[in-house]
């Protein structure tokens, strides 16, 4: 458990402004999100004597390892941002905001004959208008209850609606005037649809029209001495104003814009971006960059636009971008943005109103980010430098290992044996360099032999890339590649499902540049990454870390010796005792438990283990979901799912004719013939048995294939805890 004083901000560092704050644990996962009218006063409450804290709060602050905050201008903005972050990060200590597995929206089913107002969760549906998300379902119901006085739209379920239509009697809301009772014909479908449309307009922020109309009607009723009607209209106006307070937004509901602010000094610049969608702040991004040359604010904005939208298309590029200064010239940038969006994009400086006020909020966040970066950078660099120096001293290296590669083997009782390679540069994870391997040189469970194979393959590729780049001036180098068949780095880019890692914890991602299994090296100049560095395995580490003890270290060193590599250090980190093992040494190196170097090695080792076991689980799940279509040459996942979706099951596909198979989009005659032949050769498997329920399933039940609409679950023996205990 952490001591809250270890990460308590220094006096004066926290602003006395409204904002939203996040507590993170030691793995950088967000564990709590909260809002405050005064960040300084609220956060001070968390750092008082632990004995005075609520037990749950005490647990939270001792679990946390850091705290950060975002400044906003009003409490309304803080509320909206808090909702967005809770939805995004799913903090474990924010359970009181959770009413189900997703946040509730106020939804209007405009795709029905009689639109219905209801609370909806989960995936959004076409033809339904959504407003939210809200923190609680009761907040939606309170708002709807107020608005039904003025917009008596249907709220009942389909069953209640049909029953009322059958009996000719409306529900209670129909009797008290909070439903127009379309079920019994009191209102036509067109009029009810218009009523629902007005409800949506009001929720979208276009409130002035309806308030003015009601006020005019109230005045007319009073002039005609219809005081009861005037009083009813007065109450309706009060209900609408109360509902407006409950659903306050940052900007108008139709506003989709990105706001970019820049704070800078002579050496560095901080960029902050608020993404506003539907009038609410849906996300925030930011970074700090070094100013390597004299550069204007407009040029910084241009660089930020390129980084933000360089890979985006369509609606991902908003129709309005608000900036503190325009690039010079601005026309090419606007044209570039319009091409990426497919329609015009307004790039301008806000001059007045809510947008200018929100831009000031973004600017304050940029200024805060720059101040915090400058105060933390020195300590961060010092800590990482000290960790690398401690490792170099403990392992007797000539210099600090700026690039560290760590390898781990994972399997389930000897099946689906895989390996991982993770890379840390300057003490930080470089996920684009991660690689995954399938062990195919032998069958069975042998971690030592597996480690030898992986190290051999990785550094044989390094020598091959080194030869191709012309680093060997004498022309001597690797001649015989002699890899195991289908044995190179496994295809990258398929992040394992349900990894569960928060964005900052870093779900295992690769950049898709690894070679597929069995892909051969070709002659010619080596391709370069965008930053000019050699691709794949051409960049050597200064230190290789293996997850294991003396046997694994000896295997890794033997592999390097066989390849003639003598300038790369090797060590192993054994679990439990956290001992560091070196080649040809009988005794381990024991680093102090408080050592920054040991902590860095543990982080590298744990990341390699996580990456390996994630890939192993995904590979095992894929094997359990394998079906006869997997063996059809040239048939990818997209077309397989198209076939299953079209016919419903493999059983029905097997009985289809070639002409019927050709009717599936993307399936030509030749492919259809190949599919038909493959299914004809494949003997239908015996009925599968669901190990959880004991029921027998055939192809029509969705096993063993996974349909496009309903992803299947891997079938494996034992409880989840038992399977985890068997994994390595």
Curated annotation (Swiss-Prot):
Record InterPro entries: GIY-YIG_endonuc, GIY-YIG_endonuc_sf, GIY-YIG_UvrC_Cho, Hlx-hairpin-Hlx_DNA-bd_motif, RuvA_2-like, UVR_dom, UVR_dom_sf, UvrABC_protein_C
Q: Where is this protein localized, as stated in its record? A: Cytoplasm
Any one GO CC term of this protein is: cytoplasm
CDD domains xref list: GIY-YIG_UvrC_Cho
Please list the residue ranges annotated as the GIY-YIG domain: 16-95
- Compositional bias ranges of the Low complexity kind: 487-505
Q: Name one Pfam family in it.
A: GIY-YIG
Q: Which domain of life is it from?
A: Bacteria
Q: Name one GO molecular function term.
A: excinuclease ABC activity
- Where is the region Disordered? 473-535, 689-728
Name all UVR domain ranges.
208-243
Segments traversing the membrane: none
Instruction: Name the job this protein performs.
Output: The UvrABC repair system catalyzes the recognition and processing of DNA lesions. UvrC both incises the 5' and 3' sides of the lesion. The N-terminal half is responsible for the 3' incision and the C-terminal half is responsible for the 5' incision.
What protein family is recorded? Belongs to the UvrC family.
Description of how the protein assembles with itself and partners: Interacts with UvrB in an incision complex.
Q: What is this protein called?
A: UvrABC system protein C
Organism of provenance = Streptomyces coelicolor (strain ATCC BAA-471 / A3(2) / M145)
């Amino acid at each position: 458990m952490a001591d809250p004083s270890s990460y308590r901000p220094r006096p004066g560092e926290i602003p006395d402004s409204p904002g939203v704050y996040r507590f993170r644990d030691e793995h950088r996962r967000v564990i709590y999100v909260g809002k405050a009218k005064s960040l300084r006063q609220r956060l001070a409450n968390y750092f008082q004597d632990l004995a005075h804290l609520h037990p749950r709060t005490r647990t939270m602050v001792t679990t946390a390892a850091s705290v950060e905050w975002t400044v906003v201008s009003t409490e309304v903005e803080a509320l909206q941002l808090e909702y967005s972050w809770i939805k995004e990060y799913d903090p474990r200590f924010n359970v009181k905001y959770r009413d189900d597995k997703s946040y509730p929206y106020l939804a209007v089913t405009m795709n029905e004959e009689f639109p219905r107002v209801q609370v909806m969760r989960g995936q959004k549906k076409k033809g339904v208008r959504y407003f939210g998300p809200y923190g609680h379902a009761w907040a939606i119901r309170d708002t709807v209850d107020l608005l039904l006085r003025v917009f008596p739209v249907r709220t009942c379920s389909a069953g209640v609606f049909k029953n009322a239509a059958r009996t000719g009697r409306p529900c209670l809301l129909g009797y008290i005037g909070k439903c127009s009772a379309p079920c019994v014909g009191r209102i036509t479908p067109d009029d009810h649809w218009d009523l629902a449309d007005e409800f949506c307009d009001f929720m979208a922020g276009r409130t002035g029209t309806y308030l003015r109309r009601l006020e005019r009607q109230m005045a007319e009723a009073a002039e005609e001495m219809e005081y009861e009607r005037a009083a009813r209209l007065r109450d309706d106006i009060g209900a609408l104003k109360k509902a407006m307070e409950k659903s306050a937004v940052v900007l108008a509901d139709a506003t989709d814009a990105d706001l970019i602010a820049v704070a800078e000094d002579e050496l560095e610049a901080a960029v902050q971006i608020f993404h506003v969608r539907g009038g609410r702040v849906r996300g925030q991004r930011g970074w700090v960059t070094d100013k390597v040359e004299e550069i204007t604010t407009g040029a910084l904005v241009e660089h930020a636009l390129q980084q933000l939208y360089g890979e985006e298309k369509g609606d991902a590029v908003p129709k309005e971008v608000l900036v503190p200064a325009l690039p010079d010239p601005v026309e090419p940038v606007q044209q570039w943005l319009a091409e990426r969006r497919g329609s015009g994009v307004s790039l301008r400086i806000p001059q007045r109103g809510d947008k200018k006020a929100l831009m000031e909020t973004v600017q304050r966040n940029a200024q805060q980010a720059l101040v915090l970066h400058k105060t933390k950078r020195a300590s961060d660099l010092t800590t990482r430098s000290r960790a690398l120096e401690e490792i170099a001293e403990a392992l007797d290296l000539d210099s600090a290992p700026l690039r560290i590669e760590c390898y781990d083997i994972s399997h389930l009782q000897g099946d689906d044996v895989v390996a991982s390679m993770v890379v840390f540069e300057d003490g930080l994870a470089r996920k684009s360099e991660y690689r995954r391997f399938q062990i195919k040189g032998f069958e069975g469970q042998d971690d030592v032999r597996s480690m030898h194979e992986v190290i051999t393959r990785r550094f044989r590729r390094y020598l091959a890339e080194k030869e191709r780049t012309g680093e060997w001036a004498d022309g001597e180098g690797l001649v015989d590649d002699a890899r195991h068949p289908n044995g190179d780095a496994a295809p990258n880019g398929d992040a394992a499902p349900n990894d569960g890692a928060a964005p900052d914890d870093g779900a295992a991602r690769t950049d898709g540049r690894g070679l597929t299994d069995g892909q051969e090296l070709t002659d010619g100049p080596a391709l370069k990454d965008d930053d000019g560095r050699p691709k794949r395995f051409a960049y050597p580490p200064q230190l290789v870390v293996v997850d294991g003890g003396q046997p694994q270290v000896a295997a890794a060193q033997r592999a390097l010796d066989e390849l003639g590599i003598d300038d790369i250090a090797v060590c192993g980190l054994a679990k439990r005792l956290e001992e560091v093992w070196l080649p040809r040494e009988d005794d381990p190196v024991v680093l102090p438990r408080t050592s920054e170097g040991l902590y860095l090695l543990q982080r590298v080792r744990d990341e390699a283990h996580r990456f390996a076991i994630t890939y192993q689980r995904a590979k095992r799940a894929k094997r359990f979901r394998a079906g006869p279509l997997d063996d059809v040459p040239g048939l990818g996942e997209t077309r397989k799912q198209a076939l299953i979706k079209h016919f419903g099951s493999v059983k029905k596909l097997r009985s289809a004719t070639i002409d019927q198979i050709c009717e599936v989009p993307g399936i030509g005659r030749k492919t259809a013939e190949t599919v038909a032949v493959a299914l004809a050769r494949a003997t239908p498997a015996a009925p599968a048995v669901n190990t959880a329920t004991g029921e027998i399933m055939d192809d029509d039940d969705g096993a063993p294939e996974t349909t496009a609409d309903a992803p299947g679950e891997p079938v494996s023996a034992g409880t989840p805890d038992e399977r985890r205990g068997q994994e390595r």
